[in-house]
């Protein structure tokens, strides 16, 4: 969120509970509980949603925000979203839901929650670079940060959906 704050107005609309492997699942029966959330960062509008990551995007774009955002950031997922794993990912599902609303999206993942040195250093510059590019109409960006130290970091691999064994 701190990295996004330097890019413009930030809204956080996130699941109230862990939602791993939810894919693009949405809630079609029943109500979703949406609560304002006191996010520990200045100038951030935040809500928790009792639903899936894709539900969060639907609620944000369809109910909470008066204007479409320029971009949706999804994640940060703990664990890579590569190869077939992207089919199961709630992080990817949320980015795909943004695409359904006509909003460009970037899904972010990192190897492990406690391996964030490269992510903390490169998230903002990578996001800025991707935002400056024209994304084809029916595509999202899927960014996976390695779980290594800055000394071990070998640079950015720009690729289409990479194979799981590439990591």
Over which residues does each language-model region extend?
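Electrostatically charged, flexible surface regions
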Residues: 120-167
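Charged helix-capping and loop-helix junction motifs
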Residues: 87-93, 122-123
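Short glycine-rich anion-binding loops that position phosphate/pyrophosphate groups of nucleotides
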Residues: 18, 52-53, 77-80, 148
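Short beta-strand segments
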Residues: 13-15, 74-77, 108-109, 143-146
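A cross-family phosphate/adenosyl-ligand binding-site feature
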Residues: 3-56, 60-63, 67-68
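Alpha-helix C-terminal capping segments
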Residues: 60-66, 93-104
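Glycine-rich phosphate/pyrophosphate-binding loops
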Residues: 99-119
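Short, Asp-centered acidic motifs that coordinate Mg2+ and/or phosphate
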Residues: 71
């Amino acid at each position: 969120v701190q990295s996004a704050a330097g890019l413009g107005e930030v809204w956080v609309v996130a699941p109230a509970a862990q939602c791993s492997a939810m894919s693009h699942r949405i809630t079609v029966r029943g109500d979703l509980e949406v609560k304002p959330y006191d996010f520990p960062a200045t100038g951030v509008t935040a809500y928790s949603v009792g639903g899936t990551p894709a539900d969060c995007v639907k609620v944000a774009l369809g109910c909470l925000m008066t204007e479409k955002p320029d971009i949706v950031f999804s994640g940060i997922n703990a664990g890579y979203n590569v190869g077939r794993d992207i089919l199961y990912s709630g992080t990817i599902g949320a980015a795909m839901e943004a695409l359904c609303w006509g909003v460009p999206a970037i899904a972010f993942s990192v190897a492990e929650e406690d391996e964030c040195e490269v992510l903390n250093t490169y998230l903002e510059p990578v996001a800025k670079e991707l935002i400056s590019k024209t994304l084809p109409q029916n595509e999202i960006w899927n960014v996976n940060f390695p779980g290594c130290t800055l000394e071990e970091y070998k640079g950015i691999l720009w690729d289409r959906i990479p194979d799981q064994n590439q990591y």
